[in-house]
Amino acid sequence: MLSSITLLPLLAAVSTPAFAAVRNYKFDIKNVNVAPDGFQRPIVSVNGLVPGTLITANKGDTLRINVTNQLTDPSMRRATTIHWHGLFQATTADEDGPAFVTQCPIAQNLSYTYEIPLHGQTGTMWYHAHLASQYVDGLRGPLVIYDPNDPHKSRYDVDDASTVVMLEDWYHTPAPVLEKQMFSTNNTALLSPVPDSGLINGKGRYVGGPAVPRSVINVKRGKRYRLRVINASAIGSFTFSIEGHRLTVIEADGIPHQPLPVDSFQIYAGQRYSVIVEANQTAANYWIRAPMTVAGAGTNANLDPTNVFAVLHYEGAPNAEPTTEQGSAIGTALVEENLHALINPGAPGGSAPADVSLNLAIGRSTVDGILRFTFNNIKYEAPSLPTLLKILANNASNDADFTPNEHTIVLPHNKVIGAQHHRGADHPIHLHGHVFDIVKSLGGTPNYVNPPRRDVVRVGGTGVVLRFKADNPGPWFVHCHIDCTWRLGSHLSLPRPPARFARVSSRSSPTMPGTSSAPSTRLFLPICSKW
């Protein structure tokens, strides 16, 4: 196991354990050949695994993850960064990971150690490459922070590595080739390349391919299981259900919610749900269903979007696939607006007007003959120097201090931000460094009292209205988590004034080229100078 633990004694506090651990992980980012759906191809892996190594920690711990870039395959990108999706990065904005926002890419044969105090954060997260479309080539994995005092702990008996469920869409073609298709003048409909299969915990099947054994989740009758379901796809959403079993939703994107029984739920790219499943049926095998929804599915003959299954296997049942029809989910589907945050419910500022109101709309425009996605008619282009470096080294504190296509909106510290995402096609919007309250969802009734709270929301139809507090200094990316969409320009960043960067600016290093003063972070000199 490529991990270790160091215990650090802390002063006991109401919400902090007496001992916190430093959780040490070693990530070798390397090219390996794998065949998760029966088709062998080279990928970008974490320690040679699909999905990547599971990271686990407890509330109050610190993650220390040493990333070594061993990539050599010229058919794929050979630099990398890693984003720790869902982690707030309070006081550690420089460890967030998106290339050219908080760091330069880690070049070949270099190492970088991400060090992230978790503070009081808990829940189901994941990690993935955040350089171009690299995570499509396989660099992604689960991350779980356990809470010894979880408010839902009495509701389940089992919550461990065996109950983490990773959903992925899978491509047989390397991401740089897919990017060329996206950036083609022939892509007049702005369609994402269609995947070849869907995976559950690293196993799937494509049309005409071999019958790869299904992933199996083992249960014992009478026990209650917390499944942590993660959508780590590039484009696809999945409709998750388990034959003959109800699902009780207790968490969305790391945030505990009031228990809500459903029969199925749709999960969009980047989202996570925890559900409780009671093993209360006859000891047998049952289908875990996750049919995939993807635009243009019929254009790829390899893809059967309905053929995304795993098996719920009861102790004592034969080791075999279920004999029932695979079918599709029936019953009550999750409606997002029926979710209610369990702890400190209520949108920041209540129903009063927000201190700052943002109107955001994903649109389209043609740039150099290529149709691109935009946020508010601006197509994002990554700067040559990371946004965080500009803030720290050049004291950038106004919108005008950044290039127009960097699309940066400076927010006042500790103010309530209202963001209205206008209607359009389905886009799962992700905000780094925060969660938001969804005060109005897809044409529903406004709810400022106990709305859902999460970090990825589906925007479509009639749009959504969000609330969050700008209380976490950093340059935080906002983007659609459909890979094609954000690669084609639909993202922006929301920094705070540099005076608020307390911990980041406490670490100094020499002046970087192109800046007027020391960048004040250990990240830039060793990484950017090699880029």
UniProtKB/Swiss-Prot annotation:
Q: Which residues are Cu cation 1-binding?
A: H83, H430
Q: Which GO terms describe its cellular component?
A: extracellular region
Q: What is its main location?
A: secreted
Q: Where is the signal peptide?
A: 1-19
Q: What class of enzyme is it?
A: oxidoreductase
* A GO biological process held by the record: lignin catabolic process
Which residues take part in binding Cu cation 4?
Answer: H427, C480
Q: What Enzyme Commission number(s) appear in the record?
A: 1.10.3.2
Q: Plastocyanin-like domain location, by residue?
A: 23-146, 158-315, 384-507
S-S bonds: C104-C528
Keywords carried by this UniProt record: Copper, Disulfide bond, Glycoprotein, Lignin degradation, Metal-binding, Oxidoreductase, Repeat, Secreted, Signal
Recorded coiled-coil stretches: none
How is activity affected by pH? Answer: Optimum pH is 7.
Q: Cite the InterPro entries for this sequence.
A: Cu-oxidase-like_N (IPR011707), Cu-oxidase_2nd (IPR001117), Cu-oxidase_C (IPR011706), Cu-oxidase_fam (IPR045087), Cupredoxin (IPR008972)
Glycan attachment points: N66, N109, N186, N231, N280, N395
Residues annotated for Cu cation 3 binding in this entry: H130, H432, H479
Q: What family does this belong to?
A: Belongs to the multicopper oxidase family.
The identity of this protein, by name, is Laccase-4
Species, as recorded: Thanatephorus cucumeris
